[in-house]
Amino acid sequence: MAGLLKESMRIKMYMEGTVNGHYFKCEGEGDGNPFTGTQSMRIHVTEGAPLPFAFDILAPCCEYGSRTFVHHTAEIPDFFKQSFPEGFTWERTTTYEDGGILTAHQDTSLEGNCLIYKVKVLGTNFPADGPVMKNKSGGWEPCTEVVYPENGVLCGRNVMALKVGDRRLICHLYTSYRSKKAVRALTMPGFHFTDIRLQMPRKKKDEYFELYEASVARYSDLPEKAN
């Protein structure tokens, strides 16, 4: 429940996985305000550094995976905050237009004033001469996730654009969010949108990265036609 969450919450993240067969581990620490929808994270690669691929493909598993820090307007039930103290999980498949695929599973739990994230990722089929494996990407454009409930699961569908020089590499994201609480204990939100701006203000030698995200959940601003 939202009462367990404070205006300032800490974050700890533990990530491991492979991308095109390269094994790595990352650890992150950060903080944010769950009620204003802003968060920051500082991430170190603890194994497998320097990464031989663009960290940009992992960034959405960190911040865009940190769904407690989404500002929900008053009329939208907050699925994620309702899920505490038990927490929630999500699974995501990201398909890039050049054939690369990234799958991820994340577990979110709460320990005192700290949110704990455990993330496992698997990246396959990224072209050796593509921008991901050549580390030629330059961050993400802002995007909007379409969110809706289905059989007790919150589904997210998104199209993201990775900046590559003067062009964009497009990818499609399919996410399933599952509360650890029984569905009957939740008030599920209706169809809505989540606007996301994910940035990387700083990185160092492909082994240290700083991320910032702002996100807000909203209904459509467009009025319905009167009868």
Swiss-Prot record:
Keyword Transcription regulation assigned: no
Q: 2-iminomethyl-5-imidazolinone (Glu-Gly) crosslink: positions?
A: 63-65
Could you list this entry's UniProt keywords, alphabetically sorted: Chromophore, Luminescence, Photoprotein
Q: What does the record say about its biotechnological applications?
A: Fluorescent proteins have become a useful and ubiquitous tool for making chimeric proteins, where they function as a fluorescent protein tag. Typically they tolerate N- and C-terminal fusion to a broad variety of proteins. They have been expressed in most known cell types and are used as a noninvasive fluorescent marker in living cells and organisms. They enable a wide range of applications where they have functioned as a cell lineage tracer, reporter of gene expression, or as a measure of protein-protein interactions.
What InterPro entries does this protein's entry cite?
Answer: GFP, GFP-related
What happens upon changing residue 2 to S? Answer: In Hcred; matures at 37 degrees Celsius and produces over 6-fold brighter fluorescence and a homodimeric form
| UniProt-listed SUPFAM superfamilies | GFP-like
An individual GO BP term: bioluminescence
Q: One Pfam family from the UniProt entry? A: GFP
Post-translational modification, as annotated: Contains a chromophore consisting of modified amino acid residues. The chromophore is formed by autocatalytic backbone condensation between Xaa-N and Gly-(N+2), oxidation of Tyr-(N+1) to didehydrotyrosine, and formation of a double bond to the alpha-amino nitrogen of residue Xaa-N. Maturation of the chromophore requires nothing other than molecular oxygen. The precise stereochemistry of the tyrosine has not been determined.
Q: Which residues carry this modification: 2,3-didehydrotyrosine?
A: 64
Annotated family: Belongs to the GFP family.
Relate the assembly described in the record: Homotetramer.
Q: What does this protein do?
A: Non-fluorescent pigment protein that is lilac in color.
What else does UniProt say about it?
A: In the wild-type form, the chromophore matures at 20 degrees Celsius. Mutants have been selected to mature at 37 degrees Celsius to make them suitable for use in vivo and cell culture.
What protein name is recorded for this chain?
GFP-like non-fluorescent chromoprotein
Q: Which species is listed as the source?
A: Radianthus crispa
